[in-house]
């Protein structure tokens, strides 16, 4: 199938899907009955909210906004990594960034005498992901111009397993924090509040314009490193900027929702299938699709455990695992 060319279909369908699922997420599967009309009125200013409307404003709306921001950020990070490494299997989860950030968060939660929140957590997660990413790139030869793509993925999988092993040891040694860390490791937005929105929003608002401004250079990088260099792209600076943006995005997401997997791996392929290979289209479409997938996973997580709740990461794993196997077989 060729990429969608008509702008109404290219942009209209993903935007419409996101809006519809966002609206449904505000009132579906609620322990306290909430109607679609309640959800709509909750978004309108100038009146005293009823109990269902207050529930939407204080719980459901920040939860859905956090899901949108995290889905868009992880999809964008995955697209950038696949472009940067010329590897269709690259993602924050497979290259060890998620697990490194999660290990840093788990160690901080277990060892810190006082709770840490806000941008400090994002910074800690970004540092953990950055150290893990450097180790993967070094072990997998990712800093060489002619690196083995499979070697890079294998290094990422090995380091991810190592980090997750250390995280489990942390759980065993820090029994007082074990349940909270365990639930957080599953990846989800069930505990998201407005402070999480304000924690994520500046990172996303800062990163997205920079990435979109680099879209033309990323198009050249898609051809080959040598072609991009010949056409005037400063590869060292571009790689540094992209790596920093990826670490900021992933660190912020992991600090709020835990290590959510598969969005960064699958969504870039869906975006290229839908929008072609022009990064000016692929980058924003991947953000729309990532936000929609994360929201959908959160709604399904509520549906499967209603009136309880499941982490959205568990649903994404159920969806992503067979898709990952299909992707591996398709790539031969």
Curated annotation (Swiss-Prot):
Changing residue 60 to C: Retains 33% of wild-type citrate-mediated Fe(3+) transport. Keywords: Cell inner membrane, Cell membrane, Ion transport, Iron, Iron transport, Membrane, Transmembrane, Transmembrane helix, Transport. InterPro entries: ABC_BtuC-like, ABC_transptr_permease_BtuC. It comes from the Bacteria. Induction: Induced 1.8-fold by hydroxyurea. The complex is composed of two ATP-binding proteins (FecE), two transmembrane proteins (FecC and FecD) and a solute-binding protein (FecB). Interacts with FecB. Part of the ABC transporter complex FecBCDE involved in citrate-dependent Fe(3+) uptake. Probably responsible for the translocation of the substrate across the membrane. This is Fe(3+) dicitrate transport system permease protein FecC. It comes from Escherichia coli (strain K12). The gene is fecC.
């Amino acid at each position: 199938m060729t990429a969608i060319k008509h702008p109404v279909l290219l942009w209209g369908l993903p935007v419409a899907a996101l809006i519809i699922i966002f609206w449904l997420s505000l009132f579906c599967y609620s322990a306290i009955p909430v109607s679609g009309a309640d959800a709509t009125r909750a978004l309108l200013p100038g009146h005293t909210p009823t109990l269902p409307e207050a529930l939407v404003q204080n719980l459901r709306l920040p939860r859905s906004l956090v899901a949108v921001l995290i889905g868009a950020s992880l999809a964008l990070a995955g697209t950038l990594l696949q472009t940067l490494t010329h590897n269709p299997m690259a993602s924050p989860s497979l290259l060890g960034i998620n697990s490194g950030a999660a290990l840093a968060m788990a160690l901080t939660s277990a060892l810190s005498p006082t709770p840490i929140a806000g941008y400090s957590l994002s910074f800690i997660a970004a540092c953990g992901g950055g150290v893990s990413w450097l180790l993967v790139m070094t072990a997998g030869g990712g800093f060489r111009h002619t690196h083995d793509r499979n070697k890079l993925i294998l290094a990422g999988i090995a380091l991810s397993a190592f980090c997750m092993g250390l995280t489990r040891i942390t759980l065993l040694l820090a029994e007082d924090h074990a349940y909270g860390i365990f639930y957080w490791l599953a990846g989800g937005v069930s505990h998201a509040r407005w402070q999480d929105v304000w924690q994520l929003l500046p990172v996303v608002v800062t990163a997205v314009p920079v990435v979109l401004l680099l879209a033309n250079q990323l198009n050249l990088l898609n051809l080959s490193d040598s072609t991009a260099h010949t056409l005037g792209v400063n590869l060292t600076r571009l790689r540094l900027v992209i790596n920093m943006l990826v670490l900021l995005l992933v660190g912020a997401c992991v600090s709020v929702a835990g290590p959510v997997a598969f969005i960064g791996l699958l969504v870039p392929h869906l975006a290229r299938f839908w929008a072609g290979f022009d990064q000016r289209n692929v980058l924003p479409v991947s953000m729309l699709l990532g936000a929609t997938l994360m929201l959908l996973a959160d709604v399904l997580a509520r549906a499967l455990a209603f009136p309880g709740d499941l982490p959205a990461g568990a649903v994404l794993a159920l969806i992503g695992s067979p898709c990952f196997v299909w992707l591996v077989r398709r790539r031969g």
